Amino acid sequence: MAKRGKKYVEAAKLVDRAAAYSATEAVELVKKTNTAKFDATVEAAFRLGVDPKKADQQIRGAVVLPHGTGKVQRVLVFAKGEKAKEAEAAGADFVGDTDYIGKIQQGWFDFDVVVATPDMMGEVGKLGRVLGPKGLMPNPKTGTVTFDVTKAVNEIKAGKVEYRVDKAGNIHVPIGKVSFEDAKLVENFKTIADTLQKVKPAAAKGTYMKNVTVASTMGPGVRVDVSTLA
């Protein structure tokens, strides 16, 4: 661990903590300061001027990144009849109804995203205590409770990411891997920033995007000039 710590310290020296870099410069620095030996995830963090305790300042949704995240998402769809067939045809990894509910209750979690048709939510709701804390519960706001299972599965497989403000007003979103071309990471970064601007709550006062940073899984954070994300 000491060796990794030393690498991180050396990498951090390349970042001027007082500076706010352009999106392009920040992405270049993130790659330069990546200390992981694997293809690390690049994550953007937004500190927003909202009060998540207030219902009218909750921010939650999903967006399809133009270049995906570099991660293959395993999709579980709760559906029956024709909708189950549609989900299978769209490329869902697992499709079923009540059979998977029992499996999950017994500790099975070999999936990354859960989609459910509205008529299945009465049953899927039983998994609230299990899926909720893991952020896996289907939700209409993120497009994962829908009869259009084909669209839902296609978007997830194409690189759809969910975002949700935490109690401190922060949102963390993966924007790709360090192996991505700089331009693709920047475009993904700008896509999520633009989306968050569009969903700004009317009740939010003062500066909305207070601070934005980007970092690789094991690298230091790089502060970004918000104006360069427009």
UniProtKB/Swiss-Prot annotation:
Q: What Pfam families has UniProt attached to this entry?
A: Ribosomal_L1
Superkingdom, natural source: Bacteria
Please name the Gene3D superfamilies in this protein's record. 3.30.190.20, 3.40.50.790
GO cellular component labels: large ribosomal subunit
Keyword presence, Iron: no
* One annotated GO biological process: regulation of translation
MF terms (GO), sorted A to Z: rRNA binding; structural constituent of ribosome; tRNA binding
User: Which keywords annotate this record?
Assistant: Repressor, Ribonucleoprotein, Ribosomal protein, RNA-binding, rRNA-binding, Translation regulation, tRNA-binding
Q: What NCBIfam families does the record tag this protein with? A: rplA_bact
Outline what the protein does.
Binds directly to 23S rRNA. The L1 stalk is quite mobile in the ribosome, and is involved in E site tRNA release. Protein L1 is also a translational repressor protein, it controls the translation of the L11 operon by binding to its mRNA.
What HAMAP family does the database record attribute to this sequence?
Ribosomal_uL1_B (MF_01318_B)
What's this protein's family per the entry? Belongs to the universal ribosomal protein uL1 family.
Describe the protein's quaternary organization and the partners it interacts with: Part of the 50S ribosomal subunit.
Question: What is this protein identified as?
Answer: Large ribosomal subunit protein uL1
Q: Which gene encodes it?
A: rplA
